Amino acid sequence: MIQEDNAKKYSHAERLHTFIKEVLDKAGVAQEKLDAIAVSKGPGSYTGLRIGVSAAKGLCAALDIPLIAVETLRSLSRKQNLTHNELVAPMLDARRMEVYSAIYDSEGNVIRGTEAQILDETSFTEYLDKSIVHFIGNGVEKFQEVCTHPNARFVTSELPSAAQMAGISNQKFQEGLFEDVAYFEPYYLKDFIAGKPKKK
């Protein structure tokens, strides 16, 4: 498996197609040999999702291949190895004390679907009282500030990665679970709110 990581903010629009070419070159695969393209469907950054999905749809249309969409939180949950009866709660930073989160069991089954929620000391108590819960993602630090439950485990360093999408994408490909390229839209979860323009 080959992937390209980019930690530089606000550079996706300029660099994404270059990254795609670099990954294909490293793998020795021509665009024309691709069977499908997978993309993270959200939730997440409005701009990041829009850029990624637009690029994926454009390539699928040009190459006449199917589009596979993977939930961002589901792919993030694959980064944590669980033992039986443990849960994982992938968590992405929204604004202030808000996060996007979901809960999965050790088999990858959805225990609670994706929600936007305001965090406080009682968040996730119904799950923490019964199981060890691994909180993972860039929204974890917010919850770590208010959660003192002994069953909470915090993994703050992990971000969504294309590598974790591979297994899910392959399964969807085998099952023929494709999106309509013309009409597919990212799962923003919340309406876009414009911020102040960045200073140049």
Indicate residue ranges for each PLM-predicted region.
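N-terminal beta-alpha supersecondary unit
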Residues: 1-41
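Generic hydrophobic alpha-helical segments
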Residues: 16, 20-23, 27, 76-77, ...
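DPxDG-like acidic metal-binding loop motif
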Residues: 36-67, 72
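Residues at secondary-structure transition points
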Residues: 7-15, 46, 50, 54, ...
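Stable alpha-helical structural segments in soluble proteins, enriched in small hydrophobic residues
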Residues: 23-27, 62, 80, 162-173
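Surface "functional belts" at beta-alpha junctions
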Residues: 11, 66-160, 188, 193-194
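Acyltransferase
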Residues: 153-200
